[in-house]
Amino acid sequence: MKVLVTGSSGFIGQALVRRLRAEHCDVVGLDKVPAETTDIVCDILDANGLTKAVAGTAPDAVVHLAARIDLDEKTDLSGYTANIEGVANLVEAVRRTPSVRRAIWTSSQLVCRIGYVPANDTDYKADTLYGQSKVRTEEIVRSADGAGREWCLARPTTVWGPGMSAHYQRFLHMIERGHYFHVGHGPLWKSYSYIENIAFQYWRLLSVPTDQIHRRTFYLADYTPIDLIAWCDAFQSYFGSRPIPHLPAGVARTLALCGDAVNAIGLKRFPFNSFRLNNVLTQYQFDLAPTAAVCGPLPCDMQQGVAATVAWLRNLSAR
């Protein structure tokens, strides 16, 4: 199977290219940023260049990952053109390329605000411009019936593991240095996704029979939610750091308000505020049974993921 992966220089993209090559697929990576996993340097906003790239590759399948994924835009959707016009461009490019049999279109869990459980696939409750842009991604794909090919939508949750962004690296270094604290003592359940597991899930979505995926929407995450406290404690153990202390929720809220005040006077890098506290305390779990039924058992458990991530971070630090 020949697969075109857009966004092949990104976190998930690089892992997916490696997985597909390990499964003996013929993989072509496309991204606007050069990388070892990228064969074609092309911006998906360049409609003509994209159409030529897809037609020239003549893939059997397309996995669309290319997107702007930050939450920085606060004014309007114009900053997220890659998630709107870029998707429309790729839909048209796929439509014009007869070799393509299947396409997987990547959306996001943030088409709904964290903590909201949608009643159906088109029950949207985005509370960020990024999330709204991913709603448009889904609407474009649905309205075009996936460019007339076999298709499904994927909604990744929070993805972690080797290759993760500097933001998450800083978080883990806080644990390593003994600067992190738990809020309260109860479990905080999160549907997180380990990077090798989500790459495996994408491969399975490419491989299974049509009737198992066509016109469906899949949340992509580990099937068993992670308790944030247990997850952080696992990192602490592998780092060999001091045990993570537990701070009462009331004390944490007071500290967060102090952080808000510090941020308000211009010190944006203060490490704790109400936004981050809410991120910690908000639990979210998704029904992964449909995904598990299609994709099957995952290759890695949490402990394996933590061990691999710590080894990767130490290798980075040694360079």
Description of each model-found segment:
Residues I195, L255-L298:
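Conserved C-terminal active-site "lid" loop/helix of NAD(P)H-dependent oxidoreductases
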Residues I44-E85, R96, G115-P118:
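NAD(P)H-binding glycine-rich loop region in Rossmannoid oxidoreductase-like domains
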Residues M164-R170, G184-S207, R215-R216:
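Substrate-positioning beta->alpha
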